[in-house]
Amino acid sequence: MRNKLLFLLCAFLACFGSAKADIWINSVYFPDSGFRTWVQKHFDKPNGTKLTDEELASVKEIISWKENFSNVENLVGIQYFTELETLRLYNNRYAFQSLVMYLDLSKNKKLKKFTFTANDYFNPYSSASHGNQASRISVSAPDYPYLRSVNLKDLPNLETVVIDEHILSELDLRGCPNLKTVEVTNGHNSISTIKFDKCLHLETLNLNNCFDYNYNYMDWSLMPNLKHLNVDDNHFESLDFSSLQNLESLSCHFNHITSLNISNCRKLKSLICSGTDIKTLDCSMNDSLISVDFSECKKLEEFPKLPKGIKSITCQYVPLLATADLSLYPNLTELNAAYCDLKTFDASKCRNLVALNLNYNFISALDLSCLKQLNIKKTFISQKLNLGATRIPNQIGLWRLELPEIVDLDKIFSYDYISDLKRFNYTLYAEYYTDDNGTRHPSFVTNFLYSGSNSTNIIFSYSYQTNLFYEKDGKQTELLMDAWVAAKQVPSGVEDLAAEKTVKGVVYYDLQGHESAVPFSGFNIEVTQFTDGTSQSKKIIK
């Protein structure tokens, strides 16, 4: 009998110990008035009433912008929603009236997905919702709605963590073995510590603009199955990804790295390492690589070694492209080579190009006739030329701008000054001239030239035929390359009457471009012309 009573007592205590505490809608359990109001609306219960176990367990998902959060500043009480699987927060004081900056989710053991983003702008006008940037007003620094602290430790079911716009000083993700995606971005380089356990399921890791200046190491071996990695805009000085044999995409641009080890990343398909200090880049062993971007790698000592199967190369601001043999890459379909200081481009070495960007090189003539697959909408070939100008003997005020020998003047479709004022008043024509050795050279002749600090200003442009035709409005149209020309005087040994600079004449223009020898009433542009071909303009009001 005594043993039976003891058994019943133990059973009673066990039942009592496992019973859930009563949860009430009040300031004790939900101290934030905004969150408490949401609880009342969600369960359709007034303040001061009790929540049943079934009601608490029914909360599987909270999405702040769908749930009409209002004036919510903390989520104390969220731990009572033990079946919560998804929490998505959007901090915006002015749009959704939410400003949660400190968060403890360590008791929500069923949580699978946590996402947080913040917007440090508010939209005072309805037009803002339609993308009107003028109506987006920046919030002052103390009001930035960035996440400052979050506890996600020991959440065995957690699979996705996305945190954008934060000033976290640390992030502890230990005890989260089922992580698949972690994106902690736009942290204003605030994080000094980030901790992981072995994450065998982690496939995507994005730590863009995350770490402070003292953080320079990450143990990549903890995530051996990682496929997609982004560590852009941090302060890493060296990166060794030899343990990431399953990596498929890597972006590490604008770090301070001088070397990059990806030799074991045989599955790598996409690499972005632009804006780094690397001196060499060897991708010859990465046979799966199809896209690479090493733009603005200004310390490269040689053109990178790339696999034969590469399809896309982006190398803006890399003059070493001029030394590369693009015929080594027969599968190349996209080339982005703007600002590479190229003077020529041999399209016959990459006949399969579909997209081509050669903007703002120094190419004076271009033949694209062999690029039969080129998409005109993905083709950008505007150039800027800096030519030397020499005085033409016995021609007062005329300057010769010699063009590179590859220019065929018959291929120049059109040319003109870029300013109406110059167009009305100055001479410009193209001609071949013969030097003292009997050699013909292409050139432009002008009687206008900027002087002094303005010598690099654009004077005129010309359009050059590229021998590539495409269909437009049912007709075959030739693609033209626009070249913008600046010129600077170079010594020629020629001494003529123009050596003494005197005023040749003065003309006036009104706002409509009308010319007169005397000023118009009101606003004028006064242009003084000199005998050496230069001019000076100023605004006057009569």
Features from the language model and the residues they span:
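Concave beta-strand-loop units of leucine-rich repeat
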Residues: 61-73, 88-101, 115-148, 154-157, ...
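Residue-level detector of functionally pivotal "anchor" positions at catalytic/ligand-binding pockets or at interdomain
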Residues: 488-515
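Hydrophobic alpha-helical segments, especially N-terminal targeting/anchoring helices
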Residues: 78, 210, 296-297, 434, ...
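C-terminal per-repeat helix/turn "cap" of leucine-rich repeat
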Residues: 74-80, 104-107, 151-154, 172-175, ...
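C-terminal tail/sorting-segment detector
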Residues: 2-3, 525-542
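Short, surface-exposed loop/turn motifs with a glycine/proline- and acidic-biased composition
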Residues: 510-532
